[in-house]
Design a protein with these regions (language model features):
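Basic, polyanion-binding surface patches
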Residues: 1-180
Length: 180
């Protein structure tokens, strides 16, 4: 196993070295959605999303301070995380591009909080804003999950700065039981 140290211990790390190292962590791909104050939908592709707590059920998403969508996350009381399936790479790219009309030809429906939910997502977590924390050049938005929708399928993944796909899993004898 080889390693390529880019900084000496205790000297800090530059942004490019940090990004290259973090790119080695495989993540799922999601689109986070929110409404603005006039009720218009907004969304953005993210991979900086994670679960935080089971009781209460909390998730977080990190929004860059330069992102246009940040203002909507600072004023809205709800948002959603739409976890993408492997066939939704084009949708991920559409919501990652700069521009205001990302919802132009995208089908969506309003969840119980009113936020846009994507019907073909692998899973959707609808959240009430629980807390916002400024940290470095991002705002961490923590949401309490008020609704969860799950479908069968395989996730879209991101690793080493590129989209990836899983091999289909081997058949299992266990059943998935969602409760609550």
């Amino acid at each position: 196993m080889s390693s390529n140290p880019v900084t000496a211990p205790g000297k800090g790390v530059g942004p490019q070295a940090f990004l290259r190292a973090c790119a080695q962590f495989a993540t799922g791909v999601a689109i986070t959605t929110v409404l603005d104050s006039s009720g218009a939908p907004h969304g953005m592709t993210v991979n900086s999303f994670t679960s935080v707590s089971l009781d209460p059920p909390l998730v977080l998403v990190c929004i860059d301070h330069k992102a246009r969508i940040l203002d909507h996350f600072l004023t809205s009381q709800a948002f959603a995380i739409n976890i993408l399936r492997e066939s939704q790479q084009d949708l991920s790219i559409q919501f990652a591009r700069p521009g205001e009309d990302r919802f132009g030809a995208v089908e969506w429906f309003a969840g119980e909080t009113g936020v846009p939910l994507l019907p073909d997502a692998l899973a959707t977590l609808e959240c009430a804003v629980f807390q916002r924390v400024q940290s470095g050049d991002h705002t961490i938005v923590i949401g309490e999950v008020v609704s969860a929708i799950r479908h069968e399928g395989l996730p879209l993944l991101y690793f080493s700065s590129a989209y990836q796909r899983l091999d289909p899993p081997a058949p299992s004898n266990t059943e998935d039981h969602d409760s609550r």
